[in-house]
């Protein structure tokens, strides 16, 4: 049996742009992608903290160091620039792998700069 497990999480990213006229996807600063072990075209879940919307799309790489978080196409209707979002990717593994798996979690400040990277997340606790 394969389990779907959290692979990567970018916590409290600030949406910098919403581009309705783009084909689709989310553009993420390549530096943030690399830090979170996210690759281009990977499926990603976007959770908007400000309005509760959840959606899935795929990732395209933005300019390294740009701090861009831009929802494109139809996804742009679900967010506003300035909204805080949680970005999550998942992986499949068997139960034995899942027992020892640790996701990568990166925390961003209001400018989308990384202030913490961890592989541990429990309710109310960060290491």
Curated annotation (Swiss-Prot):
It is an enzyme of class 4 (lyase). Binds 1 pyruvoyl group covalently per subunit. Belongs to the PanD family. It comes from Clostridium kluyveri (strain ATCC 8527 / DSM 555 / NBRC 12016 / NCIMB 10680 / K1). Heterooctamer of four alpha and four beta subunits. NCBIfam families: panD. Gene3D superfamilies: 2.40.40.20. One of its GO terms (biological process) is alanine biosynthetic process. Pathway: Cofactor biosynthesis; (R)-pantothenate biosynthesis; beta-alanine from L-aspartate: step 1/1. This is Aspartate 1-decarboxylase. Keywords: Autocatalytic cleavage, Cytoplasm, Decarboxylase, Lyase, Pantothenate biosynthesis, Pyruvate, Schiff base, Zymogen. GO terms for cellular component: cytosol. It holds the Pfam family Asp_decarbox. Coiled coil: none annotated. Substrate binds at residues 57, 73-75. The keyword Lyase applies. The active site is at residues 25, 58. Is synthesized initially as an inactive proenzyme, which is activated by self-cleavage at a specific serine bond to produce a beta-subunit with a hydroxyl group at its C-terminus and an alpha-subunit with a pyruvoyl group at its N-terminus. Catalyzes the pyruvoyl-dependent decarboxylation of aspartate to produce beta-alanine.
